[in-house]
Amino acid sequence: MAIKRLINEHDMELWNNSKTFEDVIGFINTLALSVRGRENNDYTQPISDNVQRVSNLLSKVTEIIGKHEVIKDANTSRFGKIEFRDFYDDISEHSNELISKIFEGIEKPDTGKLDDICTYFINSWGDRSRIDYGSGHELNFICFLYCLTESKVFDLENDSSNIVLMLFIKYLGIMRSLELKYWLEPAGSHGVWGLDDYHFLPFLFGAFQLSTHKHLKPKSIHNPEVVEMFQDRYLYFGCIAFINKVKTTASLRWHSPMLDDISGVKRWSKVAEGMVKMYKAEVLQKLPIMQHFYFGYFLKCPEGVSEPSARAQDHHEDDSCCTDGSHGHSTWADCCGIAVPSAIAASQMANKDVRLFPFD
């Protein structure tokens, strides 16, 4: 069974120098390089049966979302909608059945391996207790794809670009639906000093897509007409369009200064290179995120890491994950703050013209 193991800085040092760390970032690099110069719909043909099966699995997730409408506090709360927990429970209950269908016609992994795959899949959709989502959950989806690759579902030589362009983009679309429908709170958002309240990898993959483009430049994100024209063709511009849609009170320079700074880089290839370095530093090397990372059969825990604690494995605890002092922080950690309503919630409440307080 996949379990959490990273609880202190010593563990993080072992993790940062481990083969598993290199396997994860190497997998992301392989996927990123495979989409250089490709638009979102530029799939590699023929599309393999296994890629199509995983795409069908994601379509089932969309169907499950449709079964759980927001009813309670639909118009009166800026925080995450509790119906998200019903969706999450539905996914958890049916994950084994759904994922088993991927292996029709090929060797199915044993129960332990399948349980690991299900763990990454379930945790790809956010946190049930806190009703939030962040880059750590996004990483779980990458681990899910990695496990399928290690299980011979994917052949990276032929499937890598389609894993990004068909599967990751479809996953991103589903997550946007969840964020909008259930007003998921941003898990560990860096506020204006982050790329996005929820996601990192669309910017990384998107920068690689654009790294060979002869005309579009990083500064093009400030041109509304260019963003509108290319939002469906490149991940990076799609992310900018989404941010502009939900953060309407100021310009990109004000609400997303990190993206504004990056837009000053001359070439997309340099942006892509910087995104990989930033992903290592801001996701894979950050304890508040990686304390929730699962190790198991496919992604081995480095030797010498702390033994697992029972509390760290609890998927559904209602209180803060930090009340036992099981890990330390050098900064205000992603997991220790109060609930922060999403920009999506603020935007939709404003559109409904709901005013809960006279100073709201």
From Swiss-Prot:
Main location: cytoplasm
MF terms in GO: peptidyl-prolyl cis-trans isomerase activity; protein tyrosine phosphatase activator activity
UniProt-listed CDD domains: PTPA
Superkingdom of origin: Eukaryota
Catalytic activity: [protein]-peptidylproline (omega=180) = [protein]-peptidylproline (omega=0)
Role of this protein: PPIases accelerate the folding of proteins. It catalyzes the cis-trans isomerization of proline imidic peptide bonds in oligopeptides. Acts as a regulatory subunit for PP2A-like phosphatases modulating their activity or substrate specificity, probably by inducing a conformational change in the catalytic subunit, a direct target of the PPIase. Can reactivate inactive phosphatase PP2A-phosphatase methylesterase complexes (PP2Ai) in presence of ATP and Mg(2+) by dissociating the inactive form from the complex.
Protein's UniProt name: Serine/threonine-protein phosphatase 2A activator 2
Lineage: Eukaryota, Fungi, Dikarya, Ascomycota, Saccharomycotina
